[in-house]
Design a protein with these regions (language model features):
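Conserved ABC ATPase signature
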Residues: 4-8
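Conserved ABC ATPase "signature" region
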Residues: 1, 213, 217, 222-237
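Catalytic Walker B motif of ABC-type/P-loop ATPase nucleotide-binding domains
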Residues: 29-32
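ABC ATPase "signature
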Residues: 87-88
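Conserved catalytic motifs of ABC-family nucleotide-binding domains
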Residues: 25
Length: 237
C-alpha cells in the first residue's frame, strides 16, 4: 500500500495498473499488450484475474503477440499487416493459420452465447499519409467476453486499440463501444472504459494507494467513494 510504484516488481506494477484501470468500474476493459516484460508466473496470475473479471460481466479486449496468451481468450482476431485475417476460437485460428503461427498449449473457455454486443466495428481504418496501419477491420464483441488481438509487433493492434478507446480518430469506418460512437462520442467512450497501455501508465514516484486515488480523480469518481474503492482494490492486490 505505502510502497512507491517504482519499487514494485514487474508483476505487481502490472496488477496495480489493472487496479487503476478498474477504479471507476468500467463496462469494457482495453489491455494493450499488458504482460510485456513480465515473468511467466505473474503473467499466469494476471490472466486468472482477467477470468474473474469476466465472471463479473466485464468485457475485455486484449492485444498480444504471445500465442499462449491469445489461447486464453474466448475468441481472437488474427491481425497481419493492418488487416484481420480471421476471427474464431483460438484453436481454430491456430489450425487455420498453422503455416504462420506456431501452435502452443491451448487453454480455451467459451463465453456464454449472449447476443448483447458491447463493441461493434465496421470497416474501421486508420491511415498515416500513404501508410495504412489498420485496414477495414470489422468484428463484434459480446458482453462478458474476452476477445484478443493476436499479431506481431507492427501488425496494427495498438492503432486499433487507440481508435476503439477514443484516443485516435478513424480515417474511415465506424465503431461503437459501450453504446457510443468512437468518432463522435469519444469522451463518453473514455468515461465507460478502462484502458491499460503497454507502459502500464503508472506514476512511479507515487505510492501504490496514491496511484489508485489519482486515477479515481481522473475518472471523476465522487470524493466520498474514492477511499472505499481504493481499499477494495488494494485488497485484490
Amino acid at each position: 500500500r505505502n510502497r512507491r510504484a517504482g519499487a514494485l516488481s514487474g508483476g505487481m506494477k502490472q496488477k496495480l495498473a489493472l487496479s487503476c484501470a478498474l477504479i471507476h468500474k468500467p463496462d469494457v476493459l482495453f489491455l494493450d499488450e499488458p504482460t510485456t516484460g513480465v515473468d511467466p508466473v505473474s503473467r499466469k496470475e494476471f490472466w486468472e484475474m482477467l477470468r474473474r473479471l469476466r465472471e463479473q460481466g466485464i468485457t475485455i479486449i486484449a492485444s498480444t503477440p504471445i500465442i499462449d496468451e491469445a489461447c486464453q481468450c474466448d475468441r481472437i482476431a488474427f491481425i497481419n499487416e493492418g488487416r484481420i485475417r480471421g476471427i474464431d476460437t483460438p484453436d481454430r485460428i491456430l489450425k487455420q493459420f498453422a503455416d504462420i503461427l506456431c501452435p502452443a498449449g491451448l487453454m480455451h473457455e467459451k463465453a456464454d452465447n449472449c447476443e448483447s454486443y458491447v463493441i461493434e466495428v465496421d470497416g474501421l481504418t486508420k491511415r498515416f499519409g500513404s501508410f495504412t496501419a489498420v485496414d477495414h477491420i470489422s468484428f463484434k464483441v459480446r458482453q462478458g467476453e474476452i476477445f484478443g488481438f493476436l499479431g506481431a509487433n507492427g501488425a496494427g493492434k495498438t492503432t486499433a486499440m487507440r481508435m476503439l478507446t477514443g484516443l485516435s480518430h478513424p480515417t474511415e469506418g465506424k465503431a461503437r463501444v459501450a453504446g457510443f460512437n468512437v468518432a463522435t462520442r469519444s469522451e463518453d467512450v473514455k468515461r465507460n472504459i478502462g484502458y491499460m497501455s503497454q507502459k502500464f501508465s503508472l506514476y512511479e514516484d507515487l505510492k501504490v494507494w496514491e496511484n489508485i486515488r489519482l486515477f479515481a480523480g481522473i475518472y471523476g469518481i465522487p470524493e466520498p467513494e474514492i477511499a472505499p474503492r481504493t481499499d477494495e482494490l488494494l485488497l485484490r492486490l
